[in-house]
């Protein structure tokens, strides 16, 4: 990225923000980690964004504040967001849903706090199999990874009054050797419906 070439997932996020057509939006990234997407949006987005990062990992947020002095960060849980209803222009779920057993609640909370848009970034998808939970070691600890059935995920979006306006290709991520069917990742741009 610092050489000027974006990875597919970074390009997907920049495109998702562009598709909202908002000027100077308040963007809250849930699951921001070390907040590298702040840099991505700052360098490559066609609009200025007011960025706030939220993560439950205190150490990750310390890294974010060291790397990006002055960044606004909060410790919080995706299933219990510390924001008022409709207070955020664009809620970005940053490669997070795949690690949450409470993903349905996280989607509901994303919808609750978002005024206009929810972006669910780099979501792994299946077409045939039901939503599947895998367990692996990552980030130095046992971690779960959820691969979503595309139709099931769309039904959850619809139930939460989120209209999918775009599904952008993200990182290549084919788990066919493990799951017996090809997988992809998408970044979903969802409009909040009244």
Regions found by a protein language model. Give the residues of each.
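Short alpha-helix
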Residues: 144-167
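Conserved class I S-adenosyl-L-methionine
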Residues: 1-21, 24-33, 40, 119-147
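A conserved beta-strand element that flanks and buttresses the S-adenosyl-L-methionine
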Residues: 92
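A short glycine-rich, Lys/Arg-flanked "PGG" loop and its adjoining helix->strand segment in the class I
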Residues: 104-117
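Short catalytic micro-motifs in class I SAM-dependent methyltransferases
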Residues: 95-99
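Class I SAM-dependent methyltransferase SAM/SAH-binding core
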Residues: 34-80
């Amino acid at each position: 990225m610092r050489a000027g070439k974006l990875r597919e997932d970074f390009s997907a996020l920049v495109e998702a923000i562009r598709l909202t057509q908002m000027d100077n939006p308040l963007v809250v990234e849930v699951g921001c980690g070390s907040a590298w997407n702040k840099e991505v949006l700052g360098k490559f987005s066609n609009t200025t964004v007011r960025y706030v990062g939220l993560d439950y990992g205190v150490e990750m947020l310390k890294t974010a504040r060291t790397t990006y002095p002055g960044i606004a960060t909060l410790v919080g849980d995706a299933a219990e967001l510390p924001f008022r209803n409709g207070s955020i222009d664009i809620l970005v779920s940053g490669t997070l849903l795949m690690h949450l057993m409470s993903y349905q609640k996280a989607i509901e909370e994303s919808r609750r706090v978002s005024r206009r848009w929810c972006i669910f970034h780099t979501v792994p998808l299946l077409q045939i199999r039901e939503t599947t939970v895998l367990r692996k070691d990552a980030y130095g600890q046992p971690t779960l990874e959820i691969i979503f059935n595309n139709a099931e995920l769309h039904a959850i979006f619809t139930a939460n009054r989120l209209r999918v306006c775009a599904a952008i290709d993200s990182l290549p991520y084919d788990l066919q050797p493990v799951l017996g069917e090809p997988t992809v990742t998408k970044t979903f741009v969802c409009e909040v419906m009244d």
